Amino acid sequence: MTSKSSPLIFERSREGRYAYSLPKSDIKTNSVESLLDDKFIRKNKAEFPEVAELDLVRHYTELSNKNFGVDNGFYPLGSCTMKYNPKINEKVARIPGFSESHPLQDEDQVQGSLEIIYSLQEELKEITGMDEVTLQPAAGAHGEWTALMIFKAYHENNGEGHRDEVIVPDSAHGTNPASASFAGFKSVTVKSNERGEVNIDDLKRVVNENTAAIMLTNPNTLGIFEKNIMEIREIVHNAGGLLYYDGANLNAIMDKVRPGDMGFDAVHLNLHKTFTGPHGGGGPGSGPVGVVKELASYLPKPMVIKDGDKFKYDNDIKNSIGRVKPFYGNFGIYLRAYTYIRTMGATGLKEVSEAAVLNANYIKARLSKHFEIPYKQYCKHEFVLSGVRQKEFGVRTLDMAKRLLDFGVHPPTIYFPLNVEEGMMIEPTETESKETLDYFIDTLISIAEEAKNDPDKVLEAPHTTVIDRLDEATAARKPILKFENLKQEK
């Protein structure tokens, strides 16, 4: 690996330099020693970087210019819905009445904020076909876990605590079995059929008296709609299990079909995907959970309800699993999502899904002559191609993904789902123009030609990025996580 990266802020530090200074305080202060127990007081001076203001500004401006995001390039990261985030969302989120409020304020002082929470709950109920919605979970996987804990409490409350198995398709998100494990369940895999859908015969084989639930994404991670969903519902419900909907792919079906109408008992949504909350960099996210009326009494508390012409917190939820997030979740994301939903309206959301599906099928059709497409039918919002043809020339999907970086395109998701060899999962979203799609398609076709005629160019990519090929094995086995370790390495 070679690096053209900037120095760390700590490496720019010079003793005695400072960015700004404050006047001496005329307020009486107390020493740290008088306020804290000895065990909380540092023995050595904290090693904060000492830099001038100009150096500080240049450092972070330089780093920001090296970042890649939806605002400066195409980001077809499959199963992540990297759509453009409208800037009006940011303006609304910065309205002082919202941005300067505090979750510990009295209800009477934050009626506007509570109304936003309540109204967003109502909008999401309509979109999903669920009877009740909580906004508390902070991310998709957190929403998965919350729903599974509701399922667990429901089964235990009905004298069926022995139900400890959750069925997960072999094409599922990795978070599904992980969330099941965190919730105390065992994961049982159900295989896909030749069309990429749940194998009904295999489902009948694995379902039993210990089945607590099945976790499904529809359309699934291959971008294929599970057309047998009503039969799946009947099989699982007849066995006493529940149906969980992973909302990662809701962008494909808004105002077309609702999870509740398909027979799902609970659903989580990703406000940071489908509803344009910004994501990447670790957060913040938001993973609301909706449930049918039979599960409503198990939702986390508090809920926000409307009482006459006022809004208030409701802690009187009989079988509640308790809080799953301090206060009431990531409120700033609610504002962005609510703004998006109200801006688009039902017709606009329907057009979003139509455009997302059209874009994915356009790319798939144009690439089908140059790459292996394991599932030939029309896809929904995303699809998976395979790099097995290019592998014949010694070039793998990883190499092609690295080469895309040289063309200013973020690589799609690779090697996922696991049941596609040399897989590359592409999700263009609805916000990209035909010109952008054509550029991406032409770029991938040119890389496929390079793989055949000049494989070394692909194998040595990327050529233009700040960081070249990472030594991923060493990075995983011997990570440098602290600055002092970096100094030792040097």
Swiss-Prot record:
GO BP field: glycine decarboxylation via glycine cleavage system
Cross-referenced Gene3D superfamilies: 6.20.440.10, Aspartate Aminotransferase, domain 1, Type I PLP-dependent aspartate aminotransferase-like (Major domain)
Root EC class: oxidoreductase
Cofactor (UniProt): pyridoxal 5'-phosphate
CDD domains, alphabetized: GDC-P
Record field: catalytic activity: N(6)-[(R)-lipoyl]-L-lysyl-[glycine-cleavage complex H protein] + glycine + H(+) = N(6)-[(R)-S(8)-aminomethyldihydrolipoyl]-L-lysyl-[glycine-cleavage complex H protein] + CO2
SUPFAM superfamilies, alphabetized: PLP-dependent transferases (SSF53383)
Modified residues (N6-(pyridoxal phosphate)lysine): 273
Keywords: Oxidoreductase, Pyridoxal phosphate
InterPro entries recorded: Aminotrans_V_dom (IPR000192), GcvPB (IPR023012), GDC-P_C (IPR049316), GDC_P (IPR020581), PyrdxlP-dep_Trfase (IPR015424), PyrdxlP-dep_Trfase_major (IPR015421), PyrdxlP-dep_Trfase_small (IPR015422)
EC number: 1.4.4.2
MF GO annotations: glycine binding; glycine dehydrogenase (decarboxylating) activity; pyridoxal phosphate binding
Record-level GO cellular component terms: cytosol; glycine cleavage complex
Quaternary structure (record): The glycine cleavage system is composed of four proteins: P, T, L and H. In this organism, the P 'protein' is a heterodimer of two subunits.
Reported function: The glycine cleavage system catalyzes the degradation of glycine. The P protein binds the alpha-amino group of glycine through its pyridoxal phosphate cofactor; CO(2) is released and the remaining methylamine moiety is then transferred to the lipoamide cofactor of the H protein.
Family, similarity comment: Belongs to the GcvP family. C-terminal subunit subfamily.
Protein name: Probable glycine dehydrogenase (decarboxylating) subunit 2
Gene name per UniProt: gcvPB
